[in-house]
Amino acid sequence: MTLIELPIGTKWNTRIAAAICYDTTNLDLVADLHGRSDMFLVAALNQDVQTFDNMVAALHFRMYQPVLLTNSGEFGGSTAQVPLPKHERLSAHVHGNQQDAVSVFEVDPSLFKSISAAKAPLAGYKGRPR
């Protein structure tokens, strides 16, 4: 697992956490990152595409931040999801194996630093430290 802080954003720096797919299944790790990172990246080389799609769907709400999973073109199954209303939740989704794909999209992780974001945060969520 890696956590880096970048001078991106108008008011606060952006903290990005990254892990490989196996480490992402460690719920203690994910719980620890909940208040520390603003975006979570997952690198995968995984055949079990459906399980990791479902995991990203759960993690972006649990962590209350954008979660991006990039899987190998050999297996497909890359996705980017943010905790927004249902019609805005899926930023990118690529399925199918043996293909190369590039998705370009914009994600603003600063939306989720406070409790006044577009989607209701978790119960008891007080925002991330700035």
Q: Would you name each region that the model predicts?
A:
Residues 2-17:
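Beta-strand-turn-beta hairpins that frame and shape the catalytic cleft
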Residues 1-6, 26-30:
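Short, charged beta->alpha transition segments
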